């Protein structure tokens, strides 16, 4: 099976290494030839709109390597084939608030949280949740990026 992956970073590399053990071939839509996965399969460099068309014709199934994938690219690729997970799942996971609210709604246990947009809201959240606490950005955080440990109120 040819698996298309939107993105060619370290997560795509780990996916490819596992897929090869199962006999699959990989195709990547990358930002650069230097991306970590680009040596592990046919790679299309996303530097013009025609590339997405070419990439879209060269796989049996497509996925993306992280929640930071551009939803507009997923929408273009899905015009030719299904993308798993769906773009609605991608949209949900691109914002921690949407993600946490869904988990809470489904009664799936998760750490206490409060969405904040100001210092006043942060102080209120700390009073409610307690310290120590971790302040996280709502978007674009990964591997510790966008996370701040709060140990005290000062």
Where are these regions (language model features)?
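Active-site nucleotide/adenylate-binding loops and adjacent lid/helix of ATP-dependent enzymes
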Residues: 94-154
